[in-house]
């Protein structure tokens, strides 16, 4: 992230610098509690603090830093599955964890009306037929007339050979082959 400007110096950072002269002021990713143990990749970088407790202008970036979903501006997740999708998307977790999480999750699927109990599949832009499911109401496409809640494991049993697309209109989506959910 060398093209991004250095982190803004906040009043809290200035207070900390005044209390700790002749040190480094470390900028921590927002996903972490500054008073807890921070992994090396959770430190954005540091400003030098002089003998008077003033923060220097130069910011030293941590080359090991990997931004968390929060640092990337992703919205607060509303479920464990959304949280995992964000951590996978930001490069902190493995895609291999996704199938088991989908099977354990409550998902929202298309429903044409309140009595619709079918699993509906739709073609994507290339013509491939997929079953869409959403992790929360916020991700339900506005064009859907309705939705119903199902367990991932129950939905997996009804996919046939059709892949499952999670949060089809984004911003974070995932495509899982039906075979990955058996």
What are the residue ranges of the model-derived segments?
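An interfacial alpha-helical scaffold signature
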Residues: 1-182
